Amino acid sequence: MTKEEQRQRIGQRIAEMRSTVKWTDENRVKRTGMTQAELSRLCGIRQNHISRIERGYYSAGFDQLQQIAEALGCQIDLVRQ
């Protein structure tokens, strides 16, 4: 898999997680979906960077991926290929 294909695959996964994440607020009301702006606010990464990551135009570093994962309530697992 080329680096470009890897970037696109990571971006697609982030977009999928962002659109399917669920959480419960103080009133126990479930919400689904999250905009790039909401994710940006939660993880501290500019919205235009999130957009570029999702589209595969920007290669996010591990720190940025960790911030995104935490904001989405996920964790990053490293798997040896």
Protein language model regions, located:
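Alpha-helical DNA-recognition elements
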Residues: 51-52, 56, 67
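Residues that mark the N-terminal boundary/hinge immediately upstream of a DNA-recognition element
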Residues: 13, 24, 35, 61-64
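Small-residue (primarily alanine) positions within well-ordered alpha-helices
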Residues: 11, 40-43, 69
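Small, basic N-terminal interaction modules of short regulatory proteins
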Residues: 81
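DNA major-groove recognition helix of helix-turn-helix/homeodomain DNA-binding modules
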Residues: 61-78
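Short alpha-helical DNA-recognition segment
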Residues: 23-52
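A short, Lys/Arg-rich alpha-helix, primarily the initiator
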Residues: 1-31
